[in-house]
Amino acid sequence: MTATSTPRLTDILFWSAALAFLASWFLPVLPDVPGWVAFRYALAPLVPYRDAGQLAWDDSVPQVLSALTNIVFMLMFALWLAKQMFRPGMFVRIALACVLLNLYWLVRAWREKGLQDLLFGYYVWLAAFVLMLLVAVLTAFEARRTSRTPTAGTPP
């Protein structure tokens, strides 16, 4: 296999992130709660859903922001796929913010002594965001390297 036909690490990480993200929507996040239902419950402070009760603002805000990271993930996916990331450093910051916001659920479960309630789907979902963060970091390094490194006389 030649160097041009082997997939780049960023491509592998990117497609792994996309696959993990997609799978997490169908995997159980909590007992009897697949990812897509957890998304709806997280948006319940804005758009009421089933039996989701009223929450204090200090729980409502991070839940809604965490739910919105799913939309951000899809936007980052589309931008990276289209190679339209004009500011790779901003891509890193946004991906990092998403990871940190999504850690809310882990911290909340730990605080309420309910870590055993978080199931495989949550960790796959979180891993998708961590993988996207790695893609963002590698892309930013590549952009920085190619924009500041002289290429005359060096092999590709």
Residue ranges, per PLM feature:
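Compact integral membrane and secretory-pathway proteins
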Residues: T2-P150, P156
